[in-house]
């Protein structure tokens, strides 16, 4: 009937996003749901499927590196996944081409953030990004934290600037370490989009408000053009208002806007 035809047409019009998956990744279900709710057609894309050319990144408007423990965090969180890309010439070229296309976007969350931090040689405008190392607590931190969104060049946070929001962290190597020179460059270029804050709303490096000891509370960094974003916390785990630690009368989660902004970007 006509209604079914409309549904088929609408499905075809949805932008396609590749939810990347590698051995040990476990955050792909929530991430796929988050982007699907925002109006994307989410594809489960195993890295080997790209190597075997079952999928081509060119066919997608966005790619996401999800959370988990890729390759068991052997030799450092995210290292195995990143090296799989860097040491396969065809794969490296394909990702470099995608990262360079400013009409498309890339997102790395948690383990995905760790992966992107190790791919700076193929991500334009990421040369000043921080390194990620073991949490100051020297243990895995999995809980709610408070963050403040600041004005940046990342479209993901459009209209969210100034918001102080709870979010979930789950990592053992999330400390963003950076020297003063690179920090100043990132700040000048508006590449810093979110920071950890304490109970008074002040940016902090102190535990437990800052779960890992990141410099100046940094938790989210974008490329110079703004189309590539790496962040340690999980916005996809707070899509339902019932998942928030504090009861609210709001109908929708404020983190829904994060994913809706991605849809606006590709449109």
Predicted regions and their residues:
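N-terminal beta1-alpha1 cap of cysteine-dependent amidohydrolase-like domains
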Residues: 1-109, 113-125, 133-142, 148, ...
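C-terminal and late-domain segments of enzyme folds
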Residues: 149-267
């Amino acid at each position: 009937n006509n209604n079914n035809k409309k549904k088929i047409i609408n499905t075809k019009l949805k932008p396609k996003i590749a939810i990347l998956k590698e051995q040990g990744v476990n955050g792909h279900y929530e991430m796929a749901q988050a982007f699907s709710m925002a109006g994307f057609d989410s594809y489960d894309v195993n890295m080997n499927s790209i190597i075997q050319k079952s999928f081509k990144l060119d066919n997608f408007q966005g790619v996401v590196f999800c959370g988990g423990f890729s390759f068991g965090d052997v030799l450092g969180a995210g290292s195995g996944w990143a090296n799989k890309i860097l040491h396969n010439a065809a794969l490296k070229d394909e990702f470099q081409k995608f990262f360079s296309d400013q009409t498309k976007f890339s997102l790395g969350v948690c383990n995905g953030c760790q992966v992107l931090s190790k791919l700076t040689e193929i991500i334009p405008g990421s040369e000043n990004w921080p390194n990620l190392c073991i949490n100051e607590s020297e243990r895995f931190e999995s809980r709610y934290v408070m963050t403040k969104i600041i004005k940046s060049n990342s479209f993901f946070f459009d209209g969210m600037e100034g918001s102080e929001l709870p979010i979930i962290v789950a990592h053992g190597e999330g400390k963003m370490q950076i020297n003063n020179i690179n920090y100043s460059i990132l700040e000048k270029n508006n590449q810093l989009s979110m920071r950890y804050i304490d109970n008074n709303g002040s940016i902090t490096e102190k535990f437990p408000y800052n779960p890992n000891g990141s410099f100046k509370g940094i938790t989210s960094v974008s490329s110079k053009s703004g189309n590539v974003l790496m962040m340690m916390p999980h916005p996809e785990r707070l899509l339902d208002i019932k998942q928030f630690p504090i009861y609210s009368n709001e109908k929708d989660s404020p983190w829904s806007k994060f994913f809706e902004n991605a849809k606006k970007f590709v449109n």
